[in-house]
Amino acid sequence: MTKRVLVLVIAAIAVSVLIPPTRAQQAPRRQPGAVYDFDFPGKASGPAPRRSLSGVWEFAKGGAEGIQADGAKAMPSDGKPEHELPFTPEGRVAFMAHKPTYGITQVPSALTNDPLPGCDPQGFPRIVLHNARTEQIIQLPNQVVILYQFNKKWRVIWTDGRELTKDPEQPGWKTKDGPPLEPRWWGYSVGTWADDYTFVAESFGFDDRTWLDNAGRPHSDALRVVETYHLVDADHLEKTITIDDPKFYTKPWVALDKLPYRLQSASFDIPEQECVPSETAKYNSLFANPAAGVDDTGK
C-alpha cells in the first residue's frame, strides 16, 4: 500500500469516528455456509416439531438482521415518539449517565463509557440486543443450553422445575440450602413449555453493570427478562424478548418482537467472533483518540 493510500485510509477511518455512525457493525448478508429464506423463494416448510428447539439457528432474512446498532430492534434509539422508552426518573438519570456510540445520545468512540469495547462481559440480554449472530440451541432433559457466536459464550436455562427468587438482594434460586448467590452477568434462567410449540424462559439476578443495548439503555438489579421461542414450522422459530424492570421503567417493553430464525444444517460450522482488548487499544490509539482530540490517557 502506498503512503498516499494509507493516509487516505487513516483519514477516512478517523472521520468516521466523529460522524454519526450508520451501519459500522454491518454483518455480511450471509454467514458462510448458511441458508436463508431468500434461498428458497416460494418453498413451504413442513410442520414444526413438538417441544424441540435443538439446532443451529441463523436469522431467516439474512446475516445482518441481528445487528442492532441503534438499540434493541423493536425499540431503536432513533428519536421517534413511538420508540421512547417508559423511563422512571431513576432510569432516565441512569440512561443519561451512559455515553454510547450509537443512538440519540451518541458520542465519539473515544469518549464512550460503554463497557463492551474494553471487552467487559456483554451479558444477557445484550448478547442478543446489539450484535446478535448465529446461535446453537442444545436441549437436554433438565436444561436448554444456548451457545452464542459472539465471544463464544453460552447460557443455561434450567427446565427442572426450580424457581427464581423475586428479591434483587437475594438473586438466584428459591432454596434454603447452599451458599448465598450473587448477581450474574448472564442472570439466572428457568424455562418451561407453554404449549407444544412455545418455550418461555425467565431470567433474573443480573449484574447491573451491563447495558441492555448499544444505545446505552440501562437496567437495574430488579431486571427480569422474558424470552419466548415459538416454533413456527420445521425450519423456523420466532424469538420475542420483553424487558421488565420496575426500578428503571414504568412498564414492561418489548425489545425483540417475533424475530425470525431459520434452522441450519447439522454440519454448519459457526464462525469465530471475539472481542480482543489489544485490538481495541490499538484502534483507540491510532484513530479514535486523535479524532476526538484526546491523548491515549483519554484526556
List each language-model region with its residue ranges.
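PEST-like low-complexity, intrinsically disordered acidic/proline/serine-rich tracts
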Residues: T2, P20-K299
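Active-site bordering "gate/hinge" segments
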Residues: T2-K3, A12
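Bacterial N-terminal signal peptides
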Residues: L8-V17
